[in-house]
UniProtKB/Swiss-Prot annotation:
This is NADH-quinone oxidoreductase subunit B. Residues 202-224 are annotated as: Disordered. It comes from Aeromonas hydrophila subsp. hydrophila (strain ATCC 7966 / DSM 30187 / BCRC 13018 / CCUG 14551 / JCM 1027 / KCTC 2358 / NCIMB 9240 / NCTC 8049). It is found in: Cell inner membrane. It is a peripheral membrane protein. NDH-1 is composed of 14 different subunits. Subunits NuoB, C, D, E, F, and G constitute the peripheral sector of the complex. Its EC number is 7.1.1.-.
Length: 224
């Protein structure tokens, strides 16, 4: 599997945020593990164990901007049982949360606030962009709206829709869990930039393209 190595680039231009340098690499543990090297196998087991704990205990930060936040809150009601994913513990402070959901329209005045809250999240941290407005500005192609939160934040999962259904939010959690399960992070006591390896997951539209092309009987709106 291809991985994206992300490192902090302090010499990057100030107007670029986050100040990261990315490059595509191979799995850093696959080569050592395939050769049967003891240290490589041990590190692979440790990585899988730590990732298992992280992906099954995702604490979201309670933050919403606009109408998509209503659908996000609906996903936390009893019919959807978000506790299955270990994400029912909503945090009131970003310092106690694992990931942040940008649910709503990111206005330019709100962008510095979102960026500040993201910086207060402790590593490891992830971002989900929920809804058309957060993904690309939606129908608000105007001066006061940022055309996508990925202009100033690194986004891990995009949820399409206006607004997305609660089931779409649950699917995004599962996709984020799959991505976290394949991550490679430093297991070290050294404080500082050591690089993060994130898997290059295939887009859902590409993965389901063949299945959707083969659909011949379209359901009516009342059957969906």
């Amino acid at each position: 599997m291809k991985y994206t190595l992300t490192r902090i680039d302090p010499d990057a231009p100030v107007e670029r945020y986050p100040q990261e340098q990315r490059q595509t690499v191979e799995d850093p543990l696959a080569q050592e593990a395939s050769r049967g090297i003891m240290i490589g196998r041990l590190e692979e087991v440790l990585q899988d164990t730590v990732n298992w704990g992280r992906k099954n205990s995702l604490w979201p930060y309670n933050f919403g901007i606009s109408c998509c936040y209503v659908e996000m809150c609906t996903a936390f009601t009893s019919p959807h049982d978000v506790a299955r994913f270990g994400a029912e513990v909503i945090r009131a402070s970003p310092r106690q949360a694992d990931f942040m959901v940008i649910a709503g329209t990111p206005f330019i005045k709100m962008a510095p606030v979102i960026q500040r809250l993201y910086e207060q999240l402790l590593e490891p941290k992830w971002v989900i962009s929920m809804g058309a407005c957060a993904n690309s500005g939606g129908m608000y192609d105007i001066y006061s709206v940022v055309q996508g939160v990925d202009k100033f934040l690194p986004v891990d999962v995009y949820i399409p829709g206006c607004p997305p259904r609660p089931e779409a939010f649950l699917q995004a959690l599962m996709l984020l869990q799959d991505s976290i399960g394949k991550e490679r992070r430093p297991l070290s006591w050294v404080v500082g930039d050591q690089g993060i390896y994130r898997p290059q997951m295939p887009a859902e539209k590409d993965r389901k393209r063949g299945e959707r092309i083969n659909v011949t009987n379209l359901r009516t709106p009342d059957e969906i």
